[in-house]
Curated annotation (Swiss-Prot):
GO terms for biological process: ribosomal small subunit biogenesis; rRNA processing. Coiled coil: none annotated. Component of the U3 small nucleolar ribonucleoprotein. Required for the early cleavages at sites A0, A1 and A2 during 18S ribosomal pre-RNA processing. The gene is imp4. Transmembrane segments: none annotated. InterPro entries: Brix, IMP4/RPF1. The lineage of its organism: Eukaryota, Fungi, Dikarya, Ascomycota, Taphrinomycotina. This is U3 small nucleolar ribonucleoprotein protein imp4. Gene3D superfamilies: Probable brix-domain ribosomal biogenesis protein. GO terms for molecular function: rRNA primary transcript binding; snoRNA binding. Residues 42-82 are annotated as: Disordered. Residues 84-266 form the Brix domain. PANTHER family: U3 SMALL NUCLEOLAR RIBONUCLEOPROTEIN PROTEIN IMP4. It holds the Pfam family Brix. It comes from Schizosaccharomyces pombe (strain 972 / ATCC 24843).
Length: 289
């Protein structure tokens, strides 16, 4: 079973690397075509790529439409076909506050299961999750009793997204929350419009069941502002034809993405797809265009 999982993972990673290389080549072809059509100077990378310039005469015979983009979210090709099964757990020896936060996350995500971590190592955790047809693993971390990290690992092959958590307020600390509804929630994603933002949006939406009922009173919001994703959970009730009352159900927190790896959480040698580099020169917002 272990050999089979390793073989399938290698085949998946090999196929994905081929798609990524083809995507980079298509991007260069588009840039070259755009520069020639606009009579603009080629950038340095295109000037030094002599093979690309030689092949351009063959590329001209292609249709003028954009080349087919590789499906970078191929890991989520079954998204919407079936309901996800999510495993929620914590780091080892969690504090009472982190354990309470894990309980609230379990109630937040339909069809999820909470596991008391104990002494289970990550490798055994992932292996057991695969054997039980788990689609995603959510691991919560803390620092001195304050939740400060969230890891989402998609099974069976990844990717794994790592977030830092800020300003965490538990549902337990919000007054007059009442009993949490476990109906499938509506999802709202705000300002996740870049390629990386859409990647994060797909990973987050994969945690929740597709096609909630129109009458469900729950709304879950992921709103991006300056690369901080604000998470909010509300319950609404209609009081008239065009009036509703909105109440916060909790918990609430801010998330900041700092790494995406092309593998599951147990793969220490997985390729890094994206990593936050605070001192690197790039545009300020990477999750929005």
């Amino acid at each position: 079973m272990l050999r089979r999982a390793v073989r399938e993972r290698r085949q998946f990673i090999y196929k994905r690397n081929q798609e990524l290389q083809e995507a980079k080549l298509n991007e260069k072809r588009r840039a070259l075509r755009k520069a020639l059509e606009g009579n603009k100077e080629l950038n340095k990378d295109l000037q030094e790529d002599s093979q690309l310039q030689k092949d351009y005469k063959y590329d001209e015979s292609r249709a003028t439409q954009e080349e087919t983009e590789t499906n970078l979210d191929d890991e989520y090709h079954r998204l919407g076909e079936r309901e996800p099964k999510v495993l929620v757990t914590t780091s080892r020896e969690p504090s009472s506050r982190l354990a309470q936060f894990a309980k609230e996350v379990r109630l937040l995500i339909p069809n999820s299961y909470r596991l008391n971590r104990g002494n289970i190592v990550v490798g055994s955790l992932v292996e057991a999750a695969r054997a039980n047809d788990i689609t995603d693993i959510v691991i919560l971390h803390e620092h001195r009793g304050i939740p400060d990290g969230l890891v989402i690992s998609h099974l069976p092959y990844g990717p794994t997204l790592s977030f830092s958590l800020h300003n965490v307020v538990l549902r337990h600390d919000i007054p007059n929350t009442g009993t949490m509804s476990e109906a499938y929630p509506h999802l709202i994603f705000e300002n996740l419009t870049s390629k990386l933002g859409k990647r994060v949006k797909t990973a987050l939406s994969a945690l929740f069941p597709p096609d909630p009922k129109d009458t469900t009173p729950r709304v879950v919001t992921f709103a991006n502002t300056d690369d901080y994703i604000s998470f909010r959970h509300h319950i609404y009730a209609k009081t008239g034809p065009k009036q509703i009352i909105l109440s916060e159900a909790g918990p609430r927190f801010e998330m900041k993405l700092f790494e995406i790896t092309l593998g599951t959480v147990d793969m220490v040698d997985a390729d890094v797809e994206w990593k936050l580099k605070p001192y690197q020169r790039h545009k300020r917002d990477v999750l929005a265009e």
